[in-house]
Amino acid sequence: MFGPKTQCVVVVGAQWGDEGKGKIVDVLAERADLVVRYQGGANAGHTVDTGEGKSFVLHQIPSGILQGAVCVVGNGVVLDPEQLFAELDALTARGVRTEQKLHVSDRAHLTLPYHKLLDRAREQQEKIGTTGRGIGPTYEDKYGRRGVRVGDLRNLARARELVRARVTAANQMLTLLGAGSAEQANAEEHLRLLERLAPRLLPLAVDAGRVVWEALARGESVLLEGAQGALLDVDHGTYPYVTSSNTTAGGAAVGVGIGPTAIDAVLGVVKAYTTRVGNGPLPTEAEPSVAQRIRELGGEFGATTGRPRRCGWFDAVVVRYAVRVNGLTGLAVTKLDVLDTFAEIPVGVGYRLDGETIDSMPADVESIGRVEPIYETVPGWQKPLSEARRLADLPPAARAYVDRLQDLGGAPVRYVSVGTRRDQIIEVN
């Protein structure tokens, strides 16, 4: 993806998350100088298999850390500092060099224990399917102009005032939500946590937008890494069954602190089929026995929660929509090998809604939940793909499947993944 005219590349999920962005970022990061996360928080789970039996799950630290790239957590991320350092220490213990490789935006908002208490209490009532990591409540504080940011820790007296006020308000809300006294937040525990973490967090704090801008000015390659997927975007996803941030490419410039004209290319990551976690519509969801087969073959369990993912067939309506709202310039198709044993593979090419054929995504979740998918069935290849390293290595039926996804999606396929390891990748020239 990187070249004379593609210095800054965004990687986004083009379905409901869990598309394999971690692997694709890991592959691209080999040629990147800087990798930046631009939204989400500890609810993300990017799995990277580096080979030789080594696999890493990254929640807040950009996947580029495994390739030795300098990594930045942008202002659009809501940062759980306790989990950040647990993740950092785990990487160091496994031999990954992290010293002077990680920076954090001083404008990033902090996810604190009271956010998690609120998240879990609300989930008991609303059943949206959150991870319980406090992401939504942190973004609420951010947009309500009452959050605590990394840079606030430079003035601990001011930070203490902010935290005490927020804990008091959180406990009032928890009481309204029916939480007992044992489920209330403790302000003094919050303050002790921040006082313990501040000396370690503040040396990482930078003006992330300036770091990225200066890297681009030096001619360096910059990779902007998204979390979740386009259909979970708070504006463009299957609302209200969405996350609380802008997961689409438009969120990258805002979540990093650069202008949109600095972005040269946007790569959308899609599975060769479709999955989602939790509640909400999934038009091409397979019947239970087939979904279970895909789930077992693809290891479709959440990297953050362990929850089984709902599984279905490739949905071209979803991907075309993602191409449009992200301005995708290319696609990376992952987990093609999961379909190795299927004799026939249905592909969703359109929807019927109230007897009419439609080829675009309805805005309201009730209508999306009522659509009937229109399928075309293509032949499977029934051969293992794990050793393929060029398109020419794929069986004709597998190559035809990739070509069909490209035609239906409306963007060129740039990468095809045929296994979990970083070397099991086909780059399409």
Named regions from a protein language model:
Residues 1-429:
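Non-transmembrane, aqueous-exposed alpha-helical and coiled segments at domain scale
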